[in-house]
From Swiss-Prot:
Keywords on record: Capsid protein, Host nucleus, Host-virus interaction, Viral genome packaging, Viral penetration into host nucleus, Viral release from host cell, Virion, Virus entry into host cell
Cellular component terms per the entry's GO annotation: host cell; host cell nucleus; viral capsid
Pfam families listed in its UniProt record: Herpes_UL25 (PF01499)
Assembly and oligomerization: Heterodimerizes with CVC1. Interacts with major capsid protein/MCP and triplex capsid protein 1/TRX1 at the pentamer vertices. Interacts with the large tegument protein/LTP.
Family: Belongs to the herpesviridae CVC2 protein family.
Stretches the record annotates as Interaction with major capsid protein/MCP: 1-45
Alphabetical list of InterPro entries matching this protein: Herpes_UL25 (IPR002493)
Protein name: Capsid vertex component 2
Signal peptide, first to last residue: none
Biased segments, Gly residues type: 118-131
Residues forming coiled coils: none
GO BP of this protein: symbiont entry into host cell; viral genome packaging; viral penetration into host nucleus
């Protein structure tokens, strides 16, 4: 019997050598497969890059189309104004006018006349031809402005650089030196003038623009009001709540009697004896990174306004009937939100109540603080005819533009009126603030008074250098670090060098928070007027009330310096 063949298990049979088990490797096939895979990968990457480029091109073309549409709207508006001017010119010729009217833009930027006779420039709308007429000093000139007063005034100081250059005082001299020594600084702001004991035009206009936009809101929400408009609503609401005055229903009524309303509010703030100041409570450190509320509902933390003096005074008066502070003591259960009634009548239904959307409340309170600083500086100020100690000499700065016929010289004010308390502030309100706000209602408070912004920033810097209180052991502080300009230069670098939107928002937020802190420190001092006057005198060279007045509006006090 033949012995049975031994059968191996399948696992062993699989691994046992056999001519049937082999692997054939085709080198050409592998090379072709690798080539096809590489080609497919390159095509996929090229398609992705093409899609990204197409998206970027689509976005760029969209931006260009929006710019072209805006430019077309501007051209159409200019054509409409030209058509209206032509119609008026033809109508004037039809009535027997011998010569065509002269365009205001072809004359000198200064027009002369009695300041009180025209209320600061031909009414709130400004002069003809789209120009704005403003008057700053009772015995000074009336300025005809096309776009921005500071830019046009400063630009006119560099027309005779072969003879003299403007010098702006110790603060700006130190700022210029610090800017020229920095490694990271916009190249377009550096010039030879900065090394001639002066400051270049581009650097001055750039820095003044940063100061003027310190309180400008960069949010595009329709619920936002400019800080000045929010302050006007708060001021009018408080005045109407405490007096029999009717609620304003138009923007013109909102601007009426601003000097009286400011005086009324400041008088109540002086009578308030509570242990409060003008600061906000930042219980959440993240709130220091943004001006807008962290809460998406638009409200800050419950204790955010808890120690703010102005909010407490307004809240105790019943301006915010929905707050817990007034709910317990309100005598009228049906109390109205008087601020909302004003915003609804003047600005429309898109603006929610301030106590609900609290960004408007915060910016409005700080704008009121800035106006209070202006009021304090000008409350007892009066313009003297003696100019010996005066730094700002308009005849020397403006030259032939300052000359006018003797028949057009302004008549002097009555002494009793000029020495009246609050006269200069009332004059500035009627002849500067009201025309500018009527022409451009969205103007921020920092653009109206950049000098007040500088006062607050200097106060905050002195407090930081003095360990938080502004006091030093020697009684006199000399700051050689140059850190006071860091935040201003940071905004300039983000705008012109890095061009980073998020970085720019962060820099503007840091500057605004410093401004808020400085306003609180300045208004909390025993004598804010003394502190403000000292800053104007030591840092910017101010000599009298006339200099203080122009400093608040210009943000600088230039003098002529001969070129050697």
């Amino acid at each position: 019997m033949q012995a049975a063949r031994k059968r191996w298990p399948p696992s062993v049979a699989f691994w046992s050598p056999s001519p049937k088990h082999y692997v054939r490797v085709d080198r050409d096939s592998l090379r072709e497969t690798r080539r096809l895979a590489s080609s497919l990968r390159r095509n996929a990457l090229a398609a992705r890059v093409a899609r990204v480029k197409a998206g970027m091109l689509r976005a760029e073309l969209g931006n260009l189309s929006q710019l072209q549409i805006a430019h077309a709207h501007g051209v159409l508006a200019d054509l409409a104004r030209l058509e209206q001017a032509t119609a008026l010119h033809v109508a004037g010729d039809g009535r027997g006018s011998g010569n065509p009217p002269t365009s205001p833009g072809q004359g000198h930027p200064l027009s002369w006349g009695n300041s009180d006779s025209h209320g600061g420039g031909g009414g709130p709308g400004g002069g003809g031809g789209g120009e704005l007429l403003i008057t700053i000093s009772p015995d000074g000139p009336t300025f005809s402005v096309k776009d921005d007063f500071r830019t046009e005034f400063i630009s006119g100081l560099y027309t005779r650089q072969s003879q003299w250059l403007p010098f702006y005082g110790p603060w700006y001299a130190a700022m210029t030196d610090s800017a020229m020594q920095r490694r990271v600084f916009p190249k377009e702001l550096k010039g030879n003038v900065n090394f001639q004991n002066s400051t270049s035009l581009k650097l001055m206009t750039g820095l003044l623009e940063v100061l003027a936009s310190a309180t400008e809101d960069f949010y595009t929400d329709g619920r936002n009001l400019s800080d000045v408009n929010a302050a006007l609503c708060l001021l009018n609401g408080y005045y109407c709540l405490r007096t029999p005055a009717p609620l304003p229903s138009t923007y013109g009524e909102l601007l009426a009697d601003l000097d009286k309303k400011m005086e009324f509010l400041i008088a109540d703030l002086k009578r308030d004896a509570s242990n409060t100041d003008f600061s906000f409570a930042f219980s959440n450190p993240r709130q220091l990174e943004t001006v807008a509320p962290l809460n998406r509902q638009g409200a800050y933390a419950p204790d955010f306004f808890g120690r703010h003096k102005m909010f407490a005074v307004m809240s105790d008066a019943g301006m915010f009937p929905n707050t817990k502070q007034t709910a317990a003591s309100a005598q009228d259960p049906g109390a109205r939100d008087i601020v909302y009634l004003i915003t609804n009548a003047v600005f429309g239904e898109n603006v929610p109540p301030f106590i609900t959307y609290q960004l408007n409340l915060r910016t409005g309170l700080k704008a009121l603080e800035l106006l209070i600083v202006v009021y304090i500086v000008l409350e007892n100020a009066h313009v003297q005819h003696n100019t010996v100690n005066r730094r700002l000499q308009l005849p020397a700065l403006l030259g032939d533009q300052y000359k006018r016929p003797a028949a057009q010289r302004p008549q002097p004010q009555q002494p009793a009126a000029m020495f009246k308390k609050g006269f200069l502030f009332s004059f500035v309100v009627k002849n500067y603030m009201v025309p500018v706000l009527t022409r451009r209602p969205q103007t921020p408070a920092s653009s109206l008074f950049p000098g007040a912004v500088l006062l607050a920033l200097e106060t905050a810097d002195a407090a930081s250098a003095g360990g938080g209180s502004g006091q030093t052991l020697g009684g006199h502080l000399i700051n050689l670090s140059g850190k006071k300009y860091d935040q201003l230069f940071d905004v300039l670098n983000q705008k012109l060098t890095f061009r980073d939107v998020q970085g720019l928002i962060g820099a503007q937020t840091a500057l605004r928070l410093t401004l808020e802190r400085g306003l609180n420190l300045l208004l909390s001092k025993p004598s804010p007027l003394t502190s403000a006057t000292e800053v104007i005198s030591t840092q910017f060279g101010g000599g009298d009330d006339y200099d203080s007045l122009y400093f608040l509006i210009l943000g600088c006090l230039p003098v002529t310096m001969a070129v050697v």
